[in-house]
Amino acid sequence: MKKILILSLLFISGWMSAQAVDLNKENRDPEYVKSIVSRSQKIVDKLGLTDAKTAEDVRNVIANRYFELNDIYEVRDAKVKKVKESGLTGEAKNEALKAAEDEKDAALYRSHFAFPANLSLFLDEKQIEAVKDGMTYGVVKVTYDSHLDMIPTLKEEEKAQIYAWLIEA
């Protein structure tokens, strides 16, 4: 029984990793899709992946993440616009605007862990960090270096903690 379970898990994990990652381009402006795919490809190119299929899958995971983030913010923006046009005032308006922000934050939190998990099917931890850094235009290094410049007395463990927090963010 144990052998069957192990073989089943190996088969399922192999099957899942062999699946192509589709680009979620339905109902999107073709120029926007082209722009996002191009931006995603630039990130993938820096990873030095040798397998074209893996590179395409990683590019699609990254592009789909950009699409997902855009969708989350578009929903938030539509709700904010609706609240502003509704005629609500005072505390009721503030509550409705806060609810829209809270829903956006919840959606971002729910999606936060799926992205590195999806990338981990194709990349190692160092490559995943390179993808995140590419998506944020190198903000981790810039922010980390700024912190070190502002607080030159940091101990090595404090530097490591700041770096870990920046990577997680």
Would you name each region that the model predicts?
Residues 1-26:
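Bacterial Sec-dependent N-terminal signal peptides
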Residues 19-169:
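Charge-rich (acidic/polar
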